Each structure stands twice: as C-alpha cells, then as structure tokens.
C-alpha cells in the first residue's frame, strides 16, 4: 500500500472510492464538496437535507456516482461534532471507512484532510490517516488456506488531497511517521496473535533478532545457563515445568548522549501460560497464547524506535518462557530467590508474570537503565477494574507517571494510575520469606504491580498492566479483533519525550 499527497480537484479524481468527510449538524457543503455535489446533481446535499446522512462520528453512506464524476463511488463519512474532533477521532473514523471501502474491493482511494488542518497540525493529520488506514485494515489471516482469502483484492494506493498550500511536506512527514508506527504496532499484534506452538520463546528470540538486524540495534540473547549464572531464581522457577527453553532478550538503542538517561523497557513474555500446578480452567485457556503482550509491546516499540530514531538511549529486556505443569514444575509453597536477592514465597503458580518481570527489571538496572517501564498482561483484577479500554499504571514517581500519561495522550491510548499507598505493600509481605507472590483476593492489580516495584531499587518506575487492553474481542475504530498492539506508540512517544 502506498500513500501519496496530491494537489488535485476532488471532482477530477479517477479512483475506485472517494471519501467525503462531513461534520455533524452541517447543513450545507463547503466550496470543495459543493462543486462535486453539483456534478452529482445535488444528491449529497439532498441526503443531508432529508437527514438520511447526519454526519455522526463513524457514520458511513455509500454513494454510486453513475459516471457523473471520474470516481466510481463515494463514501460519505461522518466526523461528529467539529469542536470535539481530535487526532484519535480522525484515526478511528479513517479506520472504519477504510474497512467499508475494503468491502467494495477498492484498490485506489482518495481522502481529504477534511479541513481539519486548521486545528490539528498537518503533520498529525497525515500521521493519523496513515495509522488509521493501516491499523484499521490489519488482518491476521496467513494461516487461512481458502480461495476467498487468497483472491481478496488489496488496497494499493491512498491519495490524500492537499486542500491548502504549503502543507504538502508536513502531511508527507506525518504519513511517513504514521506508517512506521503502524508497522511497529502490527508487529506487536502479530506476536500476540501467533499460536503458542509457533511463537515459542525460541521463535520470539528470532523475531527480536530480525528487529535488531534491520535497525542496527545491539542484541544479547541469554540462555537458561546464563540465567542460572546470574541468579535469576524467580524466572527459572516459572520456566521449570516446560520443555521449551527460556530466552531473555536484550536490545539496545543508543540514540542519545553518552552518559545520559537510559530508558529501560521490560516486557513479560509468557508465550503460553497454563497456570502451572495452579492450573487455569480449560475455558478460555486458548487465549493464554497472548500472555506475552508486554513482550510484544516492547519489541514493537523497539521496531518503532529503530525506524524513527529518537535522540535517546533505550534498553529493552524481554523475558520469554512457558508456564507449564510437570514433575519438574515449581509448586505452591516453594520459596524462590530472585536476582535482586529477595526471597519470594509462592502461594499460586499462576501469579508467574511478576516473577519473570522482577528478574528482568533487576537485569535492566544492572545494564544501566535509569528509568523503568515494565509491561505485562498481569492480572485479571485489572480487567475487572478498568475494563478493556484503559491500561493501569502503578508507580513510585509522580513526575514519571505524568510523562507517560502525556506520551499516551499523544499516542491516543488511554491509561489510568492506580493508588500505591503503603498499606498495599503490607499485603505482599510473607511470614517466611521477604515477599509472597500474591496479596490475597483484594486489590490484585495494585499488589501485583507493587510486587514488581519492590525491585526498582528506587529508580523512577512505572508498571503498565495491559491485561484488559492487549486483546480485543471486537472491532472498534483502529482496533481490530485479536491483538491490539497496545502501548507500542505510547512507548515510542515516551522515548521521544526524553530527547535532549
């Protein structure tokens, strides 16, 4: 798929589908659309007058041009209220209309910036259109073998009409950024959607190697023997029951000043989580192939960072393994010793992600990370608390939280900080070890996050629980069913915000 900014009259475009954006409560078309509507015999204005099309956000209506203009078809696209229309609204409506266009098997599409460059920068407009298009059209279907999927026509070209003078370069810059961020997000989506028999820890390491080679990132892959030497008792406890060897991946991007801040990104990579000895119910266990959403987000972020090259330093640490029951598996009642030296009483083997994370956090600090973000599909409690639209944050540093919140706003992703009062830390203290790996049935998302925070060694740290946002069971805007690639763009924006 190619994007191209062009200076052309809307009524002269010879494309399969022309997308015309209309705000809610608009009673008459602007000059650009009015000329074309005249060629269509006033059909669009007539439908607006009859309230057959109201311009509500995401509303679409297909119009056949019947040869009156070069474009074969038009799709009227509702933009909602003008004063409320922001970048994420644009990203979402573009995704929706592109899916509608796909149903018509369109190969060429033209879209206007809808005049919104007046209150959104041209660069952000181009970025949102590119992201909305690519993310909205994303499909994970390469395991399908039927002729229908093989024969489906693919969108080839998207033309963005430049309605104003002097903004072509800004639109193109935004498009280039949006394409790279969308590609990185789709890498994360693919990782989450892959079946567990394909995406083993070994395969994840190969994907990490591909990203590092593409962008010239430093790469280190630690094997089980390396983890034993480093004293990663918590990580090794989780992986003990599996026949698949664990992998710990380290990717380094050096784009900032030598001796400057180093952003540490840590991802939980459980390529399959059965729950171990504390085994999960059979219903829904298939979704546990996606318990590596944190690792997917980190690897996707490193793809974005490698492609867009912000002027900052980043270390990514990804711990990949399986959690399986066997005669060698770790058990409730065991006590494990972490790389950081703290001992952990195991009360439930299905609270394993935090055990992988703490050893990875300790290693990131050993490698020089000065600020930390860990990401994980960690708790069902987070899903209960915040649902499927919002990622939970737990932190030890309010300024660092604010920086991540700002990054998430720039990315169009929702986050919400949960409390971290001292009383919650009391819930994870053990009577026979330093810590226990669950804190009881209350405040589960908070206590799980604070467990990881015990290993941050006082460095600014934020835990992102993406249990509710890593996968979606329906299409909504640029989010498609399956893996969402959540946090990839937020992490890139965070890295960019650290530029000096």
UniProtKB/Swiss-Prot annotation:
GO cellular component, one term: cytoplasm
Listed EC numbers: 3.4.11.1, 3.4.11.10
Subcellular location(s) per record: Cytoplasm
PROSITE patterns, sorted: CYTOSOL_AP
Cofactor(s) annotated in UniProt: Mn(2+)
SUPFAM superfamilies documented for this protein: Macro domain-like, Zn-dependent exopeptidases
Reaction equations catalysed: Release of an N-terminal amino acid, Xaa-|-Yaa-, in which Xaa is preferably Leu, but may be other amino acids including Pro although not Arg or Lys, and Yaa may be Pro. Amino acid amides and methyl esters are also readily hydrolyzed, but rates on arylamides are exceedingly low; Release of an N-terminal amino acid, preferentially leucine, but not glutamic or aspartic acids
Biological-process GO terms, alphabetical: proteolysis
Details of cofactor binding: Binds 2 manganese ions per subunit.
GO molecular function: manganese ion binding; metalloaminopeptidase activity
Protein's UniProt name: Probable cytosol aminopeptidase
Ribosomal protein is among the record's keywords: no
Annotated family: Belongs to the peptidase M17 family.
First-tier enzyme category under EC: hydrolase
Role played: Presumably involved in the processing and regular turnover of intracellular proteins. Catalyzes the removal of unsubstituted N-terminal amino acids from various peptides.
PANTHER family assigned: CYTOSOL AMINOPEPTIDASE (PTHR11963:SF23), LEUCINE AMINOPEPTIDASE-RELATED (PTHR11963)
Residues annotated as catalytic: 280, 354
UniProt keyword list: Aminopeptidase, Cytoplasm, Hydrolase, Manganese, Metal-binding, Protease
Organism: Alkaliphilus metalliredigens (strain QYMF)
Residue sites binding Mn(2+) 2 per the record: 268, 273, 291, 352
């Amino acid at each position: 798929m190619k994007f191209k900014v062009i200076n052309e009259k809307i009524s002269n475009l010879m494309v399969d589908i022309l997308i015309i954006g209309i705000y809610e409560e608009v009673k008459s078309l602007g000059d650009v659309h009015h000329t074309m509507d005249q060629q269509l015999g006033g059909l669009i204005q007539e439908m607006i007058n009859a309230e057959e099309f109201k311009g509500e956000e995401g509303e679409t209506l297909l119009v056949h041009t019947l040869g009156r203009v070069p474009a074969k078809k038009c799709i009227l696209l509702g933009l909602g209220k003008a004063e409320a229309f922001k970048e994420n609204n644009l990203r979402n409506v573009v995704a929706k209309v592109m899916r509608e266009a796909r149903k018509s098997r369109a190969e060429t599409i033209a879209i206007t910036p809808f005049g919104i460059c007046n209150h959104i920068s041209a660069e952000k407009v181009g970025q949102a259109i590119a992201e909305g298009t690519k993310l909205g059209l994303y499909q994970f279907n390469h395991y399908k073998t039927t002729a229908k999927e093989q024969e489906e026509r693919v969108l080839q070209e998207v033309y963005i009409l430049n309605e104003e003078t002097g903004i072509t370069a800004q639109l193109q810059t935004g498009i280039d950024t949006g394409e790279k961020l969308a590609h990185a997000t789709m890498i994360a989506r693919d990782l989450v959607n892959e079946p567990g028999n394909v995406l083993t820890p070994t395969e994840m390491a190969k994907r990490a190697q591909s990203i590092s080679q593409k962008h010239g990132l430093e790469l280190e892959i630690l094997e089980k023997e390396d983890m034993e030497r480093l004293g990663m008792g918590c990580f090794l406890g989780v992986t003990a029951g599996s026949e698949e060897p664990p992998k710990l991946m380290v990717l380094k991007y050096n784009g900032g000043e030598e001796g400057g801040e180093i952003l540490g990104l840590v991802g939980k990579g459980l390529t399959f989580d059965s729950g171990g000895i504390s085994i999960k119910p059979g219903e829904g266990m298939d979704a546990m192939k996606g318990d590596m959403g944190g690792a997917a987000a980190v690897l996707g972020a490193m793809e974005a960072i490698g492609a867009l090259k912000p002027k900052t330093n980043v270390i990514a640490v990804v711990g990949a393994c399986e959690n399986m029951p066997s005669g060698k598996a770790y058990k409730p009642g065991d006590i494990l010793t972490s790389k950081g030296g703290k001992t952990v009483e195991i009360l439930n083997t299905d609270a394993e992600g935090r055990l992988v994370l703490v050893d990875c956090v300790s290693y990131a600090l050993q490698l020089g990370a000065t600020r930390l973000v860990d990401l994980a599909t960690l708790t069902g409690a987070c899903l209960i608390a915040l649902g499927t639209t919002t990622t939970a944050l737990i932190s030890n540093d309010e300024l660092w939280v604010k920086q991540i919140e700002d990054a998430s706003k720039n990315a169009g992703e929702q986050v919400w900080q949960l409390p971290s009062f001292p009383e919650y830390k009391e819930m994870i203290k053990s009577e026979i070890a330093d810590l226990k790996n669950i804190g009881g049935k209350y405040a589960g998302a908070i206590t799980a996050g604070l467990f990881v925070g015990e290993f941050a060694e006082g460095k600014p740290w934020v835990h992102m629980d993406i249990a509710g946002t890593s996968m979606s069971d329906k299409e909504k805007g640029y989010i498609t069913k399956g893996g969402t690639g959540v946090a990839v763009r937020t992490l890139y924006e965070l890295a960019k915000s650290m530029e000096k």
